[in-house]
Amino acid sequence: MQKQKQELHRGLEERHISLMSLGAAIGVGLFLGSASAIQLAGPGILVAYAASGLVMFFIMRALGEMAIQKPVAGSFSRYARDYLGPLAGYLTGWNYWFLWVVTCMAEITAVGIYMGFWFPDVPNWIWALSALVIMTGVNFLAVKAYGELEFWFALIKIVAILSMIAVGLLMIIAGVGNGGIATGISNLWNNGGFFPHGLKGVLLSLQMVMFAYLGIEMIGVTAGEVKNPQKSLAKAIDTVFWRILIFYVGALFVIMSIYPWQEIGSQGSPFVLTFQKVGIPSAAGIINFVVLTAALSSCNSGIFSTGRMLFNLAEQKEAPQAYGQLTKGGIPGKAVLASAGALLVGVLLNYVVPAKVFTWVTSIATFGAIWTWAIILLSQIKYRKSLKPEEKKQLKYKMPLFPFTSYVSLAFLAFVVILMAYSPDTRVAVIIGPIWFLILLAVYYGKGFHKKNAAAASERNIS
């Protein structure tokens, strides 16, 4: 048995982590999930994205404050352990693993929907299984090669979004693709007003809007594999937030200006529908390919995250020790395979309930994400309070307007959970989420993890 501590390789650069986080966040939440969110809120969805984006900015700043001072793999699980206690770290680590498994189920479900554009007679589950096998293989590449591939995956999405925004603006302003007749932006208020379903519609859309931001915290997961984390993480956090906000709000502004919001259905991506409206039907296939790569990319990031989180849990002796083993290339191979194995449930759901699986899994993933984001905020509050006055002055990357922004962000997250319980479509998440935590608690106390942690704490105090 090898006794020396195995470590993940620091092979990721700033451009990799910026684009990986961007790639993880810009997945089916924007390309497919935005359709159902638009139906709930109409053009008022722009307000929901902007407000949620501001809260996500504060959450990312809270994570950055800790990650820049203490960059480790599986960062927020480790911070929860250090500042909120071993149980919080255990729950957060396993919860993050679970939420990305569920998120990847949404992504591979989307792969099936997008492939149906070309192959309508092939069942969704076949494409879901194919995507899972391919993305698992990609995760066995050396971390630098993986980062490079994900960089280009994300770049394809970004170019597509910017192209769509540019073409859409030309149609809005100059009527390009619409017989020279400028569409203007009157569609934003001509079809029942800017808030056609009132404030209630905007509030009910928040679950899908928050799901669209899931993945932005990936920067924290990469902290243990980043070169020069102090410099890279700060820049990546700031740039990723603004890019995502511009892409989301900008893209949806163009979509709803060109296309009456009530005509944007859930039969396919709003991006494909938008290009068809512009008068370039041949572009629909290209855009469908782009959104297909978006789903694959986000699933790719998810398998990356789950593997690293299992590795971290194994290091803490709260997951099977085999998951703490690395391949020669520095990849937590067994942890990656275990995560991919769990994703087979998503393939099964695509076979059994293909019509309902997307809404179910996005709701459950959002619930898990809200726990993670809340833990980041609570850890940062405890972390800041634990610092001596001189240490607070030395912080290189501070949470702005602390503690006000931390508590307001926590209240916002709690409000979204209440809304999820209110809506019949998303209520399943508020039922399954607590059941999952009860299972984790049963394992924690049943396996005696609480005694091991107490013994370890007492040893540290003695030494």
From Swiss-Prot:
Q: Which residues form the signal peptide?
A: none
Q: Does the keyword Membrane apply?
A: yes
Query: What Pfam families does this protein map onto?
Result: AA_permease (PF00324)
From which domain of life does this come? Answer: Bacteria
- List the keywords (alphabetical): Amino-acid transport, Cell membrane, Membrane, Transmembrane, Transmembrane helix, Transport
Q: How does it sit in the membrane?
A: Multi-pass membrane protein
Its Gene Ontology cellular component terms are:
membrane; plasma membrane
**Main subcellular location of this protein, as a coarse class:** membrane
Single biological process term from Gene Ontology: amino acid transmembrane transport
| An annotated Gene Ontology molecular function | amino acid transmembrane transporter activity
Residues spanning the membrane: 17-37, 40-60, 97-117, 122-142, 153-173, 201-221, 244-264, 278-298, 335-355, 357-377, 401-421, 429-449
Q: Where in the cell is it found?
A: Cell membrane
Q: Which family does it belong to?
A: Belongs to the amino acid-polyamine-organocation (APC) superfamily.
- The name this protein carries in UniProt is Uncharacterized amino acid permease YtnA
- Species, as recorded: Bacillus subtilis (strain 168)
Q: Please name the taxonomic classification of the source.
A: Bacteria, Bacillati, Bacillota, Bacilli, Bacillales
Which gene holds the coding sequence for this protein?
Answer: ytnA
